[in-house]
């Protein structure tokens, strides 16, 4: 659950409402500074009208109240991460993982149903190779000379699985080639435990884990469904799909000459299953290197009789992690990658989640872990948390609680105060925009701008002992509420003290 600080749907205020559309445009043009004098009256009227609802949210709000409140709620299946269960998650998976979890949180908050799913690729040759890699490594550790295949899995996680397999099956499992698939299945389950732990450590909890192997019973009826579309044909002993008719560079093989399904066949079955479950929209988050795969899958969805526009692919570009300006050291645990657990250990959950949605997904992301340790305005997480902590500090100095100032009139604020209130009240508009445009970086951008506006106002205005103390404290409570709400939707915790 997201906890306190979430505005109920009925009490969310957005700057796109008719009463304040013109004022919002002018405020945006002035960089969220004080409203121009010609807009002062309109801004004051808007904030006065909505201040009671917004301020009540400070002390009376929870996540469940926000559900089923969208004007046109969508039923969405969000599939993300879906890494092969052959090793721990690495930095290439982190960006999509953080984006997906944040997207699901925002969608649920806005009133949509966003179900999350991880597709386990457990039917391919890579699972058998995992078993072979473990068997060979176990024999090597026992002093045998072994010959590894050209491609195999290595790293400390392999060594960690070996004693677990030995305890379950005995040493003979590593020498009996007829049991390599049994070893592989065991290892796959152990790797999934590692993946689930890493995700939990990052605050990410997938609702459903869909096994490729479990869907194999749907292969034959799905292929028959495709054949009825007239878009399948046989050539060279293989069964092909005419994906080139819908934008793919060539037709694709679905069933090999030995009757084994291709990877594409498994994906077609899976996506037919998704739409049969009644989802209006299916969203997949993929690495940018899968861009060429989109056309063939959309073609298959179309041939299955679904509107292919209901399948949406969001691509995530690569991440380059630095330390002291140099490429971050690879992990021994995975052999040749920077692990998700490495990133968590280096910068912590909050910093990781913030940074990994701080840029558009289609833009490459590069950052230095040392910059996130700085305690100044160059570190956005510190700067935003400092704003939230300052609010708590000034309430303590005034000897008051947020609930004590809810009755204060925002109409007593000057133009600068109204400008800050207007900025804080813009959160819901930002959330809708970020969700609908898929540009989640708009949320950290909003927080950075709000924190800058707050610190400027804080430094230029006396609060405790001033004529309009309660109105200013109520304004600060609203800013803190917006920060807490946004942080909760990003999977972060706002600091009370710093």
Segments predicted by a language model, with ranges:
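Cationic, low-complexity basic patches in intrinsically disordered or flexible, solvent-exposed regions
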Residues: 18, 37
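NTP/phosphate- and nucleic-acid-binding module
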Residues: 1
């Amino acid at each position: 659950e997201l906890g306190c600080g979430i505005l109920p749907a009925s009490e969310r205020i957005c700057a796109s409402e008719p009463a304040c559309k013109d004022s919002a445009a002018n405020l945006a043009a002035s960089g969220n500074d004080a409203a121009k004098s010609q807009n002062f009256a309109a801004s004051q009227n808007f904030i006065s009208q909505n201040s009671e609802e917004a301020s009540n949210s400070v002390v009376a709000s929870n996540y469940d109240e926000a559900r089923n409140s969208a004007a046109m709620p969508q039923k969405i299946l969000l599939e993300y991460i879906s890494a092969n269960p052959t090793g721990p998650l690495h930095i290439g998976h982190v960006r999509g993982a953080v984006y997906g979890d944040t997207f699901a949180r925002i969608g649920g908050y806005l009133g949509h149903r966003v179900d999350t799913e991880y597709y386990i690729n457990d039917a391919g040759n890579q699972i058998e190779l995992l078993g072979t890699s473990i068997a060979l490594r176990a024999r090597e550790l026992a002093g045998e000379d072994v010959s590894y295949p050209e491609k195999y899995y290595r790293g400390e996680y392999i060594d960690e699985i070996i004693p677990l397999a030995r305890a379950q099956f005995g040493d003979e499992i590593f020498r009996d080639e007829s049991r390599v698939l049994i070893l592989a299945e065991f290892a796959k389950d152990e790797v999934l435990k590692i993946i689930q732990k890493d995700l939990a450590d990052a605050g990410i909890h997938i609702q459903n884990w869909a096994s490729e192997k479990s869907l194999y019973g749907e292969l034959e009826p799905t292929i028959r469904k495709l054949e009825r579309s007239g878009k399948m044909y046989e050539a060279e002993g293989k069964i092909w799909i005419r994906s080139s008719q819908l934008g793919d560079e060539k037709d694709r093989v679905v069933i090999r000459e030995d009757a084994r399904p291709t990877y594409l066949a498994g994906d077609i079955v899976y996506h037919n299953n998704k739409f049969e479950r009644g989802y209006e929209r299916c969203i997949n988050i993929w690495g940018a290197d899968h861009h060429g795969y989109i056309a063939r899958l959309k073609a298959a969805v179309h041939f299955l009789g679904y509107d292919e526009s209901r399948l949406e692919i969001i691509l995530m570009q690569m991440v380059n992690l630095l330390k002291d300006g140099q490429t971050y050291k690879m992990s021994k645990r995975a052999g040749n990658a920077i692990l998700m657990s490495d990133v968590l250990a280096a910068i912590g959950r909050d910093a990781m989640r913030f940074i990994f949605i701080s840029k558009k997904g289609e833009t490459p992301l590069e950052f230095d872990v040392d910059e996130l340790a700085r305690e100044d305005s160059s570190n956005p997480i510190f700067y935003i948390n400092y704003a939230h902590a300052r609010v708590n500090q000034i309430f303590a100095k005034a000897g008051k609680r947020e609930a004590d100032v809810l009755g204060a009139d925002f109409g007593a604020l000057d133009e600068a105060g109204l400008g800050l209130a207007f900025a804080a009240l813009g959160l819901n508009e930002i959330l809708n925009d970020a969700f609908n445009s898929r540009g989640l970086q708009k949320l950290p951008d909003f927080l950075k701008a709000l924190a800058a506006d707050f610190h400027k106002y804080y430094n230029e205005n006396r609060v405790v002992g001033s004529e309009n103390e309660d109105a200013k404290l109520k304004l600060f409570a609203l800013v803190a509420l917006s920060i807490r709400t946004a942080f909760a939707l990003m999977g972060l915790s706002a600091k009370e003290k710093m």
